[in-house]
Amino acid sequence: MTPTRRRLIGWAIVIGYALSLALPAVQTDAADTARMPGWMMLVVGGVFWWTVPTIGWFANLSVPTALAALRWPLPRWFSALSLLLTAVTLVEACRWSTIPTTNKVVETVTRHYSGFYLWVVVVVASAIVVGLRTRWQGQPAGTR
């Protein structure tokens, strides 16, 4: 993979992730909530993930792992562990239906919006990048 292509893939991941944080992600059953943007889900999920037993927030870690894989060679064990954790947390994120709040009430997610689906695409693309970069580095030099 050429350096230019790696940069383009890296920028696509960064821009896609930034857009997923800017776009509306979910709506809850609370009367006072409109569409919650992705950045709010990132902050709320990061701070209060332990109040609702969910690990889906940790799928966000696949993005910096993919960017690192585009830049530096990763050991196979690290890539395998990253892919496994991303798969588990992504499944959990897709099953996710509650949001913790600051007033100790758990709100139910009633609808997902484009920010959530773009986030899922970026996380899956990041996992694919990690897997492919490991595979490419394991091939003989003439087969890339």
Q: What residues fall within each predicted segment?
A:
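Compact integral membrane and secretory-pathway proteins
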Residues: M1-R144
